[in-house]
């Protein structure tokens, strides 16, 4: 053992010269604590607290000199450094962080910790609290560190009297690098030393004895004045070395006799003055592990005592080094947890009934797992979720940074053939597939679904959580408010709408000077532009920041947006089907001074803000997209944006929580993200990019993320590939194309299918000819998917009226049409077990190389992109532009928006623009009646015919069946 180490400790214990610099204050920052803080004394030390200080401070007075090569401390630190270097070869940015919570003035070991950490390659965060900090204050700090995923270890440097059980067990065991918690101690006693952290102080005692050549077998060990985890750890470690261990307190009557018999003495607390050193026999090895000695406040007990081994003085420094070693082990465990692994998921058991009950009865019969348990099972940390009730949680975007080096899973899109008005079960197939993958094949999988609008829920469609034994639970929470994302969109959208009309009013009723003075007021004698106003000045080419420096022309240019009311495209929204809001007149009150105009309401999910939410990939990206949204043109034909109105920051504030995906679960306890639900006709109709990206990281390599596209493949899938995949950069592995015998019969010439009207006998009896004729639509949709180079698996969603012959016929014809595979699915009636064949088919298809490609180059002219979609996807002969559509195309091209992708808005009930044309219409001319732009979302949307953005209520809406049991508060009637 290097002789320098005891010298270092004695040097640290020596009072600092008054004239020498005190370096610790420079490492601290202000604390709200009372009295003296770290280091005691007066001034800055008494009022400050240090956070996030890297272990890189230069050595100064009191710093330990580098130990000799043969030093055990050097060996420990060098070993830690080498292990960390190996970890960093795979994860170069990884650097473990040790947090030290200090209450009081025990500073003398701080520089030792700093320099050892620096040498090993760690960072240290030092948190200084006032000396008089109570139990609750210390625990508050512990809990913060527990949930901070950037910190990998936590040590306490507090008064010995403060080490209460409550404080010790507030520590997260996996961050307890001092081995203080009951969990770590219990694992040690049980023999699981490799799974726990062991007290560095106790380990230091054992290491020093063994390195000095002392055999512990048969030795008598006396531990005096120790208690708690240190006493238990010392006893456990010594006993495993074959030693006879005794514990005693200082006031024990037989203490002198025990001391004289002991070969090794370990002091756990300061020696009382009345106990003479002569009681300790010459040649006895004494270790002082008392709190005061380890913190450098007291000298070693062996000072001046002949025959007591000097190695006892080295406990403190070696303990600090072993803490660093524990830190590296903690970091290694943390990295291992970040790596892809199969989830240890507790799946929920199903007991399917026949006949199958209603969706809400099935949902209510299954008790979901607590969402925090689900989150932990799939690898989410406690600080990465925000819990809403018992079964919902938002997931923070910080997860993407933590898992940025993890490989993505496979990306699967569920699309469909041209549907009947009843829908063909894409959501049900999506949920059935992930239940099969995870609950039955033990494969990590995630479903990513759109959030349904309350309008259709209370109108004609009912719930959208899947159906039968393949649904999201609790389905009433899924279908109603969820976590309020749509309400946030409504608030943000209508704030922007109000800002537009208010700005027109104020510009119409004020002079240039008055308008400018109100936009840039003097506050407490100071006049300055806001951040967003400075951005507008820059866009206008006005390079001035002093409001008083603008010329009259510049003030006018800045203050007046000069919006042309006839060009306003931004409408108010509400999440209710209300046909009487399709055309309204606003501004009729006398207070609006004649600024009335015709306007309309849209359904909330038709708002461009919903499309922005679905396509954004970060908070900053969302803010930029919101600012770019074009709401109108000025009288010179230039676009007016949310940024011009100065409302971008406020919109972002309203949307800051909505951007976080919502975590729920399926009936079998597998994870689901429910996030964003843009209108599938005027927008792209897919769930959010962020939900997909987070899910792909969570499932890891070998896992699957399954998402769905709205309507048929000709609409939803085409938009998914050309719009969503461009925005996300993600490449799909497989398309699952959902078909039903019912829909195929309709395309084969069967009678019309109408919601709310019983099906004709053609749909409930076997009819192979209708099925065969209708497979032309299935073949066309397979061909559309193949345009993008993605393999197709056909999922035949089986109904109870389908016959074996019909099922076999569809699967055979699908394979002939080029599908990779085609399988019948029974998830609706028996859950994930009924989609196991589909899961195997998807896994096999995903193992093949995807040759994904976009349908068109966005740099093509707008007209050519529209024509490409019409001819290649819909099968049209050509397109026909109305004069208004041509005018809009010319305007958008002139404004610089011609390079955006296309989002076609047309009926979903036919490949053509005519809903009654089933099968595969050919030779038609696709009429483009209008062209609009969602610049913030990032696409141009041509309107094919007329397209309503506000649904209406039918004669008998779904709300007739919806009720609440006022005794149990259970929702009834949500299908």
UniProtKB/Swiss-Prot annotation:
Residues 346-975 are annotated as: Formyltetrahydrofolate synthetase. This is Monofunctional C1-tetrahydrofolate synthase, mitochondrial. ATP binds at residues 420-427. It comes from Bos taurus. The modification Phosphoserine is found at residue 354. GO terms for cellular component: cytosol; mitochondrion. It is found in: Mitochondrion. The modification N6-succinyllysine is found at residues 187, 593. The modification N6-acetyllysine is found at residue 187.
């Amino acid at each position: 053992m290097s002789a320098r180490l005891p010298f270092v400790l004695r040097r640290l214990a020596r009072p600092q010269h008054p004239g020498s610099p005190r370096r610790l204050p420079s490492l601290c920052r202000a604390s709200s604590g009372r009295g003296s803080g770290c280091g005691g004394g007066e001034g800055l030390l008494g009022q400050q607290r240090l956070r996030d200080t890297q272990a890189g401070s230069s050595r100064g007075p009191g710093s330990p000199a580098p130990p000799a090569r043969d030093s055990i401390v050097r060996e420990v630190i060098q070993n830690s450094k080498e292990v960390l270097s190996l970890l960093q070869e795979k994860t170069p940015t990884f650097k473990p962080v040790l947090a030290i919570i200090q209450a009081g003035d025990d500073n003398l070991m701080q520089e030792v910790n700093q320099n050892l950490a620096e040498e090993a390659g760690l960072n240290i965060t030092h948190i200084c609290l006032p000396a008089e900090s109570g139990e609750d204050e210390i625990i508050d700090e512990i809990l913060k560190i527990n949930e901070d995923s950037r910190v990998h270890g936590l040590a306490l440097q507090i008064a010995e009297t403060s080490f209460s059980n409550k404080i010790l067990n507030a520590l997260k065991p996996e961050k307890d690098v001092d081995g203080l918690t009951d969990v770590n101690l219990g694992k040690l006693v049980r023999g699981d030393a490799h799974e726990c952290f062991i007290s560095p102080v106790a380990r230091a005692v054992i290491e020093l004895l063994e390195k000095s050549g002392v055999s512990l077998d048969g030795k008598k060990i006396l531990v005096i004045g120790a208690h708690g985890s240190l006493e238990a750890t010392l006893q456990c470690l010594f006993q495993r070395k074959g030693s006879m261990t005794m514990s005693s307190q200082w006031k024990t009557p037989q203490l002198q006799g025990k001391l004289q018999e002991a070969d090794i003495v370990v002091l756990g607390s300061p020696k009382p003055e009345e106990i003479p050193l002569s009681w300790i026999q010459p040649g006895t090895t004494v270790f002082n592990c008392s709190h005061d000695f380890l913190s450098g406040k007291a000298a070693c007990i062996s000072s001046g005592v002949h025959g007591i081994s000097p190695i006892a003085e080295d406990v403190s420094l070696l303990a600090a080094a072993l803490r660093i070693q524990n830190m590296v082990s903690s970091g290694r465990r943390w990295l291992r947890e970040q790596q892809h692994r199969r989830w240890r998921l507790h799946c929920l058991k199903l007991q399917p009934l026949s006949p199958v009950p209603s969706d809400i009865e099935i949902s209510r019969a299954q008790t979901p797992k607590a969402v925090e348990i689900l989150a932990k099972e799939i690898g989410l940390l406690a600080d990465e979720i925000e819990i809403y009730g018992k079964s919902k949680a938002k997931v923070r975007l910080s997860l993407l940074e933590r898992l940025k080096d993890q490989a993505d899973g496979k990306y699967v899109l569920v699309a469909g053939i041209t549907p009947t008005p009843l829908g063909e079960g894409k959501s049900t197939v999506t949920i059935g597939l992930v239940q099969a993958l995870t609950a039955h094949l033990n494969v990590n999988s995630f479903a990513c679904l759109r959030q349904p609008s309350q309008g259709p829920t209370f109108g004609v469609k009912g719930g959208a959580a899947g159906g039968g034994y393949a649904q999201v639970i609790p389905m009433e929470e899924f279908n109603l408010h969820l976590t309020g994302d749509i309400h946030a969109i409504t608030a943000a959208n209508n704030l922007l709408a109000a800002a537009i009309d208010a700005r027109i009013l104020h510009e119409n009723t004020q002079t240039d000077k008055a308008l400018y003075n109100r936009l840039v007021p003097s506050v407490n004698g100071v006049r300055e532009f806001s951040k967003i106003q400075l951005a507008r000045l820059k866009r206008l080419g006005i390079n001035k920041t002093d409001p008083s420096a603008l010329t009259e022309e510049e003030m006018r240019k800045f203050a007046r947006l000069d919006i042309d009311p006839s060009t306003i495209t931004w409408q108010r929204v509400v999440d209710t089907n209300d046909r009487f809001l399709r055309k309204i007149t606003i501004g009729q009150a006398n207070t609006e001074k004649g600024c009335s105009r015709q306007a309309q309401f849209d359904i909330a999910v038709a708002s461009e803000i919903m499309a922005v939410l679905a396509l954004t990939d970060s908070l900053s990206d969302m803010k930029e997209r919101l600012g770019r949204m074009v709401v109108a043109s000025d009288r010179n034909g230039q676009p007016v944006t949310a940024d011009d109105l100065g409302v971008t920051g406020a919109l972002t504030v309203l949307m800051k929580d909505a951007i976080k995906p919502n975590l729920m679960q399926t009936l079998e306890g597998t994870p689901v993200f429910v996030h964003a639900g843009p209108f599938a006709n005027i927008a792209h109709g897919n769930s959010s990019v962020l939900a997909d990206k987070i899910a792909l990281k969570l499932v890891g390599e070998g896992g699957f993320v399954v998402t769905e596209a709205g309507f048929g493949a000709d609409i939803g899938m085409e938009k998914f590939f050309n719009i969503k995949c461009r925005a996300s950069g993600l490449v799909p592995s497989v398309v699952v194309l959902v078909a039903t015998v019912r829909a195929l019969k309709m395309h084969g010439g069967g009678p019309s299918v109408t919601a709310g009207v019983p099906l004709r006998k053609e749909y409930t009896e076997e009819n192979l000819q209708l099925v065969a004729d209708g497979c032309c639509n299935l073949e066309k949709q397979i061909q559309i998917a193949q345009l993008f180079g993605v393999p197709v698996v056909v999922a035949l969603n089986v109904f109870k009226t389908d016959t074996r012959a019909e099922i076999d016929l569809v699967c055979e014809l699908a394979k002939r049409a080029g599908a990779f595979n085609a399988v019948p699915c029974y998830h609706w009636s028996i859950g994930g077990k009924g989609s196991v064949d589909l899961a195997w088919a998807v896994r096999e298809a995903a193992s093949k190389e995807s040759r994904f490609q976009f349908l068109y180059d966005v740099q093509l002219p707008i007209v050519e992109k529209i024509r490409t979609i019409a001819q290649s996807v819909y099968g049209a002969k050509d397109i026909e532009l109305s004069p208004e559509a041509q005018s809009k195309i010319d305007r958008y091209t002139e404004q610089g928006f011609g390079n955006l992708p296309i989002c076609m808005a047309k009926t979903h009930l036919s490949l053509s623009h005519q809903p009654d044309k089933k099968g595969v219409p050919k030779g038609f001319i696709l009429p483009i009646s209008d062209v609009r732009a969602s610049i913030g979302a990032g696409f141009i949307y041509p309107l094919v015919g007329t397209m309503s953005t506000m649904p209406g209520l039918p004669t008998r809406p779904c709300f007739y069946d919806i009720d609440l049991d006022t005794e149990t508060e259970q929702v009834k009637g949500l299908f």
